[in-house]
A protein has these predicted regions:
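Membrane-embedded and interfacial regions of multi-pass energy-transducing membrane proteins
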Residues: 1-93, 97-410
Length: 410
C-alpha cells in the first residue's frame, strides 16, 4: 500500500496537498461556535449536489411534464419524497448557514487585509447561490414558482433602453414558458454548480494562503516557535475535524426535525400555491419570493417615487442591486485599526446591531403584503441598511478602540 501511495504521490502531490490544507494547516486555537458555519456550508453543498442529481433522474424539464414529474417523485419514486424534502430544506439551510457565516465575518473583521480576496470570493459564492436558488425555484412549475419568476424577470424590464430586450433574452419567450424552464434547468443543474464549486475552491485556497482569522482578529503567524509553528495554532486535523463533528451533529438534529416534521415550514420553505400547477391566466393573491430573498424584495418595494424621469420600479431595482453590490466593497470601507468587534467601539457594535435588526425586519416585510405603514418602515430600514456601509469609513475611524492582546484569548 505504501508503495502504491508513493507511486501516486510522485505523480500527483496528494500528501503535500493534504498536509498544506488539512494535516499541517494551523488554525487559531480559539475558534468558537461561529466557526462551525463554514464547514456546515460545505456539508449542505454536498447534500444539495447529491439530492439534486437523484431528483434530476426523475424530473421532466418541460412545461407539460414538470409539475407532474415532481408529484411523481413525491408519490411513486422510492424515497422520492425524502429526496425532495432534503433538497428543499437544504436550500433554506444553505442560506441560513451562509448568512450566519457572513455575520461572523462582519463581527470578527474577516474581510480586512490580507483577507480581501477571501471576502470577494465569498460574496461571489453568495451571488451565484442566489442565482442558483432562483433558477431552481422555477423548476417545480407551481403557481408561486411561475409568478415569482415572472415578477423577478420583469424587473429587468425597468432598465432604460435595453430592459425589454434583456427580459426577452432571459425568458427566451414573451412570457415564462417551457423554453424558460429548459434554460433555467440547464443553468441550475450544470452551469451554476460548476461555477459555484470553482468559487468554493478559490475561497478555500485564498483562506489557506493567508490563514484563518479568529475571534480576536489576531494574526497567529506573528508568534511562532523555534520550529516555525504558530504558538496559538493547532493542526486543523485532527483537532477541528473532530471539533466540527459536534456542530454537524447539532445541525443534523435540527435539519432532520425540519425534514421529517416541518418540511414546508408553514409555507416558508414550500409555499402552498406551489402545490398547484402553474397557470398563466390566474395570478396568486400575494406574490412573494422565498424568505432568503425577501429583505432585498422589501427594499425594492420601498421605492415608490419616480425620479429624474425614471420610474420608481427602476430605482427600486437599483436599490436592490446596490444592496448586494455594496457588500463587495466592505474591506475598503472599514477603516478601523482593529478587526474584531471584541475590540471595536460602541459605534461599530451599535451599527452592526442596527444593521442585523434592519435586515431581519426587512425579511419579514418582504414576506407580507405591502401597506402604507409597512412601506414606510421598509423605507426607514432600507436607509439604515445603507448607512451601515456608507458611514463605516467615518465611525470606524472616529471611535475609540480597546487594546488588542498580542496572543489569542479564549
Amino acid at each position: 500500500m505504501n508503495k502504491l501511495l508513493n507511486w501516486v504521490d510522485e505523480r500527483l502531490p496528494v500528501v503535500d496537498a493534504w498536509n498544506k490544507h488539512v494535516g499541517k494547516y494551523y488554525a487559531p486555537k480559539n475558534f468558537n461556535v461561529w466557526y462551525f458555519f463554514g464547514s456546515l456550508a460545505m456539508l449542505v453543498l454536498v447534500n444539495q449536489l447529491i439530492t439534486g442529481i437523484w431528483l434530476t433522474m426523475s424530473y421532466n424539464p418541460s412545461a407539460e411534464g414538470a409539475f407532474a414529474s415532481v408529484e411523481y417523485i413525491m408519490r411513486d419514486v422510492q424515497w422520492g419524497w425524502l429526496l425532495r424534502y432534503l433538497h428543499s430544506t437544504g436550500a433554506s439551510a444553505f442560506f441560513v448557514v451562509v448568512y450566519l457565516h457572513m455575520f461572523r465575518a462582519l463581527m470578527y473583521g474577516s474581510y480586512q487585509k490580507p483577507r480581501e480576496l477571501i471576502w470577494i470570493f465569498g460574496m461571489l459564492i453568495y451571488l451565484v447561490l442566489m442565482a442558483e436558488a432562483f433558477m431552481g425555484y422555477l423548476l417545480p412549475w407551481g403557481q408561486m414558482s411561475y409568478w415569482g419568476a415572472q415578477v423577478i424577470v420583469n424587473l429587468f424590464g425597468a432598465i432604460p433602453v435595453i430592459g425589454d430586450d434583456l427580459s426577452l433574452w432571459i425568458r427566451g419567450d414573451y412570457l415564462i414558458s417551457g423554453i424558460t424552464l429548459n434554460r433555467f434547468f440547464a443553468l441550475h443543474v450544470v452551469a451554476l454548480p460548476i461555477v459555484l464549486l470553482g468559487l468554493v475552491v478559490l475561497h478555500i485556497l485564498a483562506l489557506h494562503e493567508v490563514g484563518s482569522n479568529n475571534p480576536d482578529g489576531i494574526d497567529i503567524k506573528k508568534n511562532k516557535d523555534e520550529n516555525g509553528i504558530p504558538k496559538d495554532g493547532i493542526p486543523f486535523h485532527p483537532y477541528y475535524t473532530v471539533h466540527d463533528l459536534m456542530g454537524v451533529g447539532v445541525f443534523f438534529f435540527i435539519f432532520f426535525v425540519v425534514v421529517f416534521f416541518f418540511p414546508e415550514m408553514g409555507g416558508l420553505f414550500l409555499e402552498k400555491p406551489n402545490f398547484q400547477p402553474a397557470n398563466p391566466l390566474q395570478t396568486p393573491e400575494h406574490i412573494a419570493p422565498v424568505w432568503y430573498f425577501t429583505p432585498f424584495y422589501a427594499m425594492l418595494r420601498a421605492v415608490t417615487v419616480d425620479f429624474i424621469g425614471l420610474p420608481a420600479k427602476f430605482w427600486g431595482v437599483m436599490v436592490m442591486g446596490g444592496a448586494i453590490a455594496i457588500l463587495f466593497v466592505v474591506p475598503w470601507l472599514d477603516r478601523s485599526p482593529v478587526r474584531s468587534m471584541r475590540y471595536k467601539g460602541m459605534l461599530s457594535r451599535s451599527a452592526l446591531a442596527i444593521f442585523v435588526l434592519s435586515f431581519i425586519i426587512l425579511g419579514y416585510l418582504g414576506l407580507v403584503p405591502a401597506t402604507a405603514g409597512r412601506t414606510t418602515v421598509a423605507q426607514i430600514l432600507t436607509v439604515f441598511y445603507f448607512l451601515f456601509f456608507l458611514l463605516m469609513p467615518f465611525y470606524t475611524r472616529m471611535e475609540k478602540t480597546k487594546p488588542v492582546p498580542e496572543r489569542v484569548t479564549g
